[in-house]
C-alpha cells in the first residue's frame, strides 16, 4: 500500500450530483442557482472583500511599512554553514560556489548560530561579535 494508491472504500462515497441534466434529477434547468441575479450567471460572483459599494476594509485602513530593497542583496550565514565550505579562506565567492549564497547576494554577515570546530579564515564578510569569538576559539581568524 502506498500513499498514491489510497482510495476510499467501495460504496463509501456518493458520486457527485450532475447539475442541469433534466427536471427529473432535481437539479435541472437552473441547476440549483435560483432565478436571475449575479450569482446565477456564469462567472458571476462578488470579489473577495467587496462590501456592496461601501469602502472596503482593506482600503479604509492606512498603508504601513515598506519592503527593504537591500534585503535582496544582503544575506546571513550561520557558523555551521561555514563549516561545510571546503576552503581555507571563506569569502563571498567561496560561499557562492558552495551554493550557500545565491548569485544576487553582494554582502553577507556571519552570525553565531550553530558551531564551528575547524580553523578557517573569513575574509571580506561582516562578522558579529559572538561569531568572531567562536571562529577565533576554533583557531581561525577574521580579516576585513
Curated annotation (Swiss-Prot):
Residues passing through the membrane, by range: none
Molecular-function GO term, any one: structural constituent of ribosome
Signal peptide: none
Top-level taxon in the UniProt lineage: Bacteria
PROSITE patterns: RIBOSOMAL_L15
Keyword RNA-binding listed: yes
UniProt KW keywords: Ribonucleoprotein, Ribosomal protein, RNA-binding, rRNA-binding
Keyword 4Fe-4S tagged: no
InterPro entries registered for this protein in UniProt: Ribosomal_uL15 (IPR030878), Ribosomal_uL15/eL18 (IPR021131), Ribosomal_uL15/eL18_sf (IPR036227), Ribosomal_uL15_bac-type (IPR005749), Ribosomal_uL15_CS (IPR001196)
Record field: compositional bias (Gly residues): 21-31
Pfam family, one: Ribosomal_L27A
Gene Ontology BP term (one): translation
GO cellular component: cytosolic large ribosomal subunit
Residue segments, region Disordered: 1-57
Protein function: Binds to the 23S rRNA.
Quaternary organization: Part of the 50S ribosomal subunit.
Family from the record: Belongs to the universal ribosomal protein uL15 family.
HAMAP family: Ribosomal_uL15
Protein name per UniProt: Large ribosomal subunit protein uL15
